């Protein structure tokens, strides 16, 4: 049947992220505030929130392994999702801490998707990517892959590597990843 369109007062039908928001909401990967009818597309995404989103997106399953981080007790509502991300090698910590409330950068979000894809062989360059000098050495392959496969383009918004990734950008990345590779690639 026809796909349901979810209406949020802060998502204009012609916004560059409108289709992507509809995609993530209709697939249950992300949700908005349904009482306020807001998706909050410009909001940043915390590392713990991204773990939940990716778990849903990739069809994660509970894991017995523990994730040892100095700033997690194991009682957090998002702990199961973080454990899954870490167990899959999609995310790690920094200096023994996970930093659950830290905001994810554009580059970090792209690295996670690149890992989910199995770190495919990279073809192409970042020669025409305007922020190439800002890409970290460890993120170069992932960003090159995303740029050359159209996961990020200059048409919709600024994909500045170190900038906090927005909910709209995450929605767009996931929709394009699904089109490129398929949702349940984990």
What are these regions (language model features)?
Residues 1-18, 26, 31-51, 55-80, ...:
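Feature responds to low-complexity, polar/acidic, surface-exposed segments characteristic
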Residues 23-24, 85, 146:
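PEST-like intrinsically disordered low-complexity regions enriched in serine, proline, threonine
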């Amino acid at each position: 049947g026809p796909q349901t369109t979810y209406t949020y007062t802060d998502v204009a039908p012609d916004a560059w992220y409108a289709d992507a928001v509809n995609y993530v909401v209709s697939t249950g990967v992300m949700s908005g505030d349904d009482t306020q009818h807001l998706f909050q597309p410009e909001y940043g995404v915390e590392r713990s929130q991204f773990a939940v989103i990716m778990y849903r997106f990739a069809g994660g399953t509970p894991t017995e392994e523990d994730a040892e981080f100095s700033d997690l007790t194991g009682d957090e509502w998002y702990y199961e999702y973080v454990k899954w991300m870490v167990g899959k090698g999609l995310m790690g910590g920094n200096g023994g801490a996970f930093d659950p409330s830290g905001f994810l950068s554009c580059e970090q979000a792209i690295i996670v998707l690149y890992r989910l894809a199995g770190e495919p062989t990279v073809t192409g360059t970042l020669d025409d990517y305007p922020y190439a000098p800002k890409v970290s050495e460890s993120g170069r392959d992932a960003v090159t892959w995303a740029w050359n496969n159209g996961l990020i383009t200059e048409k919709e918004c600024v994909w500045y590597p170190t900038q906090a990734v927005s909910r709209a950008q995450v929605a767009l990345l996931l929709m394009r990843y699904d089109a490129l590779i398929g949702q349940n690639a984990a």
